[in-house]
Amino acid sequence: MRPLLAVSNAIDALNEKIGYVCNLLVLLACLVSAANAMIRYAFSYSSNGWLELQWYMFAILVMFGASYTFKRNEHVRVEIMYLMLSERGQLWLDMIGTLFFLIPSCLLLAYLSWPFFMQAYNVGEMSGNAGGLIRWPIKFVIPAGFVMLALQGVSEVIKRIAALQGYVTIDAKYERPTQ
């Protein structure tokens, strides 16, 4: 179990770093958005590249923020049945849901989005707007984000198996109370 927990810790550490970058991107996206608006109104100047950069940052936040949010156990969940279960039952439900729904869905979506990225990469797809950005890097974020979420799912399954066997303790409840 120790080697598996080491893998889980490595995945968690990677997603912590991704989460840190995503947190910085929130600030950067706000600054770019505010600067864009001020320049547009103060100088009557607008750049498609800066506008596209805003939605590139938002796409990165959404796709990579999902794995960080899952690591922190802050995804939305319907707790009607979950709260009625014992802690062990909650661990089992988390593990089964992750194994049979989350991981297969993420891997399928990564697989299906890969050709979308490859086509853009192979043709060197550019924005249709004057001064716009190249498109293939942001299209890579789609399969990469799903792979990272699937990897975090693997980490969560490892932790739950370890908890069920008594190697670790996991607080299966939300980090914050239900709002």
Regions found by a protein language model. Give the residues of each.
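Alpha-helical transmembrane segments and membrane-interface helix-loop junctions
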Residues: 1-179
